[in-house]
Amino acid sequence: MDFSEVVLCDEDRLFQTELRAFLADVVTADVINRDRQTGDNFDEGVHLALGAAGYLERDWLPESQGGFSAVQRRIWELEIGRAHTPWFHWGTTAMVANAVHDFGSAELRDEVLAKTLSGHYRLCLGFTEPEGGSDVATCKTRAVRDGDGWVINGSKMFTSNAHHAHYVFLLTNTNPGAPKHQSLTMFLVPLDAAGVDVQPIRTVDGDRTNITFYSDVRIADRYRLGDVDGGWTVLRTALDAEHGTGERDDSGLQKIATMTEHALLLAEGLDVVAGSLAGSVVGEDSVAYRLGRSVARMEAALSTPGMYGRVAIATALRELSPELMDVQGASGGLASADLDAQYLFRLGVPMGIYGGTLEVFRNMIAQHALGLGRPAYAPAAGGRS
């Protein structure tokens, strides 16, 4: 019996065939090469095409309201990755759209959601601050009431895709005297508002992220999400979705999309490296052992679920990519048209940071899965402060 391919019903097989043909038409070699060169992880033409075809809306909606079935959703995720679709920022947009739906006013929902699902609006995250690290609750970006609106001042790091987005899901401090989890308010800030400045930052893997500055940015109260000083409730919902700690559905097909797609890149990179070696080299016991060990590690990481998979995949990419460079020798450090080892090596560094650092995830596993206490960051007795 062949377990390499799942037998689909006629409806799902047709869905897969149509989706595969659609992606082959819009995700061209030029799109993939341009995305690799720019590091944007986004292509507006592809995004608008997906919106016009109704795929974005069906991905966002629950099945009961016209969204994908569980099997179709899995097909969708796999085909998106298979086509190398510049895609990672849709997960952010969809997550923020959920927050707008759950916590926004009717007026804000009407303004944002329809154009988001058509692909015309994109949404990004404004959590981390230049000096804040992973603890986003230490927010210093201030929002102060001004009549029936708000004035915002501050800055945010890692506002990825802000240069293609229309709104930022912005965490602000509205009550500096209160405990940090009771001082926060969330806003959906239009990025074309006066006083917003988006500046690029290049990561070691060639991706583009941004730092955004907010200087006397004035917005109406209708852009507030949730209660004043109740932003932690709004934020926790989004963070649980980003970290993959909440149940996505009842089918067990939860998936941290970015991690899985990068694991598939590792699989392709491994194949490219093996194919680039002369037959005599591959036949050497030491090389065959290292390639085989890499395959086993990659397969184990891909099959690891939830939070554990997030750690396993990022760790595998970080540890296996230098192994592949070493096997290739001097050529392993050179860029090429193929998916080369040096690209995977550079990709592995930020992969352990975005979506929540590996340290944060290990602490989450320790607390929520193993039942251990919260981590203690205080210096040991007698140690240096």
Where are these regions (language model features)?
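C-terminal helix-coil-helix/basic helical segment that borders enzyme active sites and/or dimer interfaces
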Residues: 31-38, 288, 292-340
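A short core secondary-structure module
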Residues: 153-197
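Amphipathic, small/basic residue-rich leader segments at the start of a protein or domain
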Residues: 1-90, 111, 115, 269, ...
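A short, Trp-centered hydrophobic/proline-enriched beta-strand micro-motif
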Residues: 119-127
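A structural signal for short hydrophobic beta-strand segments in well-ordered beta-sheet cores
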Residues: 141-144
